[in-house]
């Protein structure tokens, strides 16, 4: 395979308490790709970052309703609903209460040591959300968290925009999106629990996405032992 792309000026960045990577095969489109990257990150932050008190999802969670929801919010809502349906409810945006009960109530970098786990309520599923699309009005009976699907959508959107000009790889927090033109070599993605490893398993991908997020890095201590950010909605 052609590994050269991984050596040509990748941009490494941090956002939402996670690391990220942007590789652009054609250097002349690097500035365009960086602009697209930060534009979509800012749009996602304004729409669905529950740690941003001014975001639309924070307003919805705080007030139980959201009026005049943006097109971006509906875009992320559609992605969350799609993930919910595809996983038969295992990827459930109504686990926000459970995440908070286990200590993930603030951005990962600010989770305190020794969290005391609170009691949790059953998740509600997508039925918790009522949407009037024509009026862009939503109500919810419980807090929502689109984190499981939002950053995956962000990397997909960035890759789709940049792919009109260059082969590209975008990664945020282990969610990877790639695109290549006809005849190009695939992107080679290494998957390792604790960062780059020479002997890590590798996946060759021409176009599409790979989810590599796990429970090994984003962990914290609680009175019930180590906790992580992946919640099973059947048990909380």
Spans of model-derived segments:
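Mature catalytic core of soluble alpha/beta enzymes
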Residues: 1-235
């Amino acid at each position: 395979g052609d590994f050269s792309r991984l050596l040509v000026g990748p941009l490494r960045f941090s956002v939402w308490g996670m690391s990220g990577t942007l590789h652009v095969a054609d250097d002349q489109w690097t500035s365009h790709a960086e602009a697209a990257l930060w534009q979509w990150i800012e749009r996602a932050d304004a729409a669905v970052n529950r740690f941003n008190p001014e975001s639309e999802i924070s307003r919805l969670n705080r007030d139980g309703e959201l009026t005049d929801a943006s097109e971006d919010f509906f875009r992320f809502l559609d992605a969350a609903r799609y993930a919910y349906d595809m996983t038969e409810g295992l990827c459930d945006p109504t686990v926000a209460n459970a995440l908070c009960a286990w200590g993930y109530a603030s951005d990962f970098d600010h989770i305190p040591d020794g969290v005391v786990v609170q009691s949790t309520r059953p998740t509600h599923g997508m039925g918790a959300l009522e949407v009037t699309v024509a009026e862009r009005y939503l109500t919810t009976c419980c807090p929502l968290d689109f984190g499981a699907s939002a950053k995956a959508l962000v990397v997909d959107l960035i890759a789709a925009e940049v792919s009109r000009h260059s082969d590209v790889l975008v990664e945020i927090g282990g969610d990877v999106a790639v695109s290549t033109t006809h005849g190009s070599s695939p992107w080679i993605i290494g998957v390792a629990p604790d960062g780059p490893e020479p002997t890590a398993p590798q996946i060759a991908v021409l176009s599409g996405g790979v989810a590599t997020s796990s429970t090994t890095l984003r962990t914290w201590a609680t009175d019930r032992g180590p906790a992580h950010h992946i919640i099973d909605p059947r048990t909380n």
